[in-house]
Amino acid sequence: MKSDYDTTSEEAGPSQQEIGRWPLALFILHRCLAPYFARPEPYQRVLLYLQAVLSEIPRKNGWQIAEHAKQARPYGMQRLLSRAIWDDEGVRNEMRAFILQTLSHPSPVPLGAPSGTKPRIPFPVIVIDESGFPKRGTHSAGVKVQYCGATGQGENCQVGVFLTYVTDLGHALIDCALYVPADWCTDAARRQSAHLPETVRFQTKPELAQHLVQRALSASLPIRWVVADTVYGHNTDLRLWLEEQGFSSALAVPANEVVCVETAQGYRICEVASIERQRPGATLDWQRLSMSQGTKGERLFDWAIVPHVHRGIVDGCHFVVIRRCLDDPREIAYYLVVTAPGTSLHTIVLAIGARWWIEVDLENAKDLGLDHYEVRSYTRTLL
């Protein structure tokens, strides 16, 4: 979900030089996908489909994709995305491997900078976020009136949970899952009409996010940090699971999230919004730091870090990080952070700043037709 102060724009999209390299990369990728297609027709058609979505046609729907591919009717493209037999999970896994190869160094990038040098983002970072896709009808899998991040209000829409993978070489969406509301999961007729597999049960968005991160972990993706907004940070189970996997994490939480911190009266349980009032001397050590470079310049905020009690002790690994807007000091965000002892606040801030790359990736994906899809069934909805 995009913040009011986010500065991503068309300038954050791919450059003409990058676009010029797409055809060769596309042919290489297409060759990698061959084992996942049982017949030559859909395998050849998927190349035409990918060429169309990378083109500048105004809408990436069945008719316009077919016209770009010099096909008289859209039925072949529609069949490719709905009923044609091919291994969509295998294609997803191959795409993820292709992205990992593209965004990886031959040797690991050091976690921290040498003493006295400028901190840098602790790559690789996994970013979790969701996106909504407004719909007019009621038959697409999982559609209902619910919060839609694309419009900032309740809409008849589908919602997907997404992962972006960020390294110093670039960033890309690597996985997604369709959120299926509980009332859909218990409606046998709707399940049948949308081809929901029997294995699909209701999962909250944080549960879907955990499943996606587990899938990335099972695919041996190197991961150092996981960052996400309050939808995911407010979920205790997800936070604990990420810590159990050994990841550093910086997850936004609402102002009423409860922690135990040192106060003037000793250790007390309080809401994160009241930490400054509770602190001895009622002061925090604020530092003005940039979380990333935006299209309008450095994204500067004031930041403070406070250790909090975890399992009865202050262990030097668990913190509340507070971000205050320069233009309006009343605009404050809170993060629960788990990281290695000695990690600098600036490094944590840079990890948090990596979250905005998923906004860029979702914008670029929608430019390529992510929100133009016409598939109603569950299996290939977010292709």
Regions found by a protein language model. Name each.
Residues L169-A194, E198, A250-I358:
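An anionic, glycine-rich sequence signature occurring as long contiguous blocks
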Residues A141, F202, V320-V321, I352, ...:
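Short alpha-helical segments used as structural interaction elements across diverse proteins
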